[in-house]
Amino acid sequence: MLLIHQAINAIGELVLALTIPFLWWLIVTRRQVRFDRWLGFFLPPVQRTWLTTVIVVLFTLLLAIPLPLIVDHGILATFVFNHRGFAGIPAALVYAIVGTSLPEEILFRGFLLKRLQDRFGFLPANLTQAICFGAVNGLLLAGAGNWLVTLIIVLIEMVIGYCLGWLNERRSGGSLYTSWGIHALLNTVSALIALFT
C-alpha cells in the first residue's frame, strides 16, 4: 500500500512540477528547442575536472546525510518510512528518485535556474534558485515548532541547492542528470536511514 501511495504522490508531484515549465515553454520557446532539452534532459559532456566535481559532491553529502540523524523524524517527509525495514525499500526508492528529487530538480534547476540565468547571468540566478529551494523546504518544516532547527535546515538546503546548480551549469553543460542523480542519492540515504531507525 505504501508503494502505491508513493507512486501516486510521485506522479502528482511530477505533474505539478512540469505544469508551469511546460506552459512557459509552450508559449515562449516551443519553436526553438525541444522541451526535454530546454529543461536539461541530455547527457552531460565528459568531465575534464573530476576532482572539483567530486569535492562538491562529497561536500553536499556531508551536509545532507546528518540531517535525518539530528532532526526529529516526525517532521521529515521520510517519516512514513520509519521502522519499515526492507519491505519499505521499493516505496522509498520511488519517493527518493521520482517523487521528490525529480520534481524539485525540474522546478528549481531545470526551470528556474535556466530561465533566470538567460536573463541575469549565472550567479544571481543560482543564488535565487538556491534561496527558493531552501525556502520551500523550510516552509514544509514551518509547523515543526523549533525555528532554529528549521533555519539550519533551510540554510543547509540553500547551500546544497547552490552546489547542485553549480554542478549542472558549470560542470555538466546544463544537464539536469547530474543534480538529479545526487539529489536522488541524498533522498535515498535519508529514506534508508528512516527505514532502519
Regions found by a protein language model. Give the residues of each.
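Juxtamembrane helix-loop-helix connectors linking adjacent transmembrane helices
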Residues: 2-9, 33-103, 118, 145, ...
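Membrane-embedded alpha-helical segments of multi-pass membrane proteins
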Residues: 11-19, 90-94, 154-159, 185
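Membrane-water interface of transmembrane alpha-helices
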Residues: 19-34
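Hydrophobic alpha-helical transmembrane segments
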Residues: 50-54, 90-94, 123-128, 151-155, ...
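Aromatic-anchored segments of alpha-helical transmembrane domains
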Residues: 60-66, 130-139, 184-192
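Membrane-interface helix/loop boundary segments of multi-pass membrane proteins
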Residues: 106-128, 169-174
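Small-polar-interrupted transmembrane alpha-helices in polytopic inner-membrane proteins
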Residues: 122-138, 157, 161
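Functionally important transmembrane alpha-helices
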Residues: 150-197
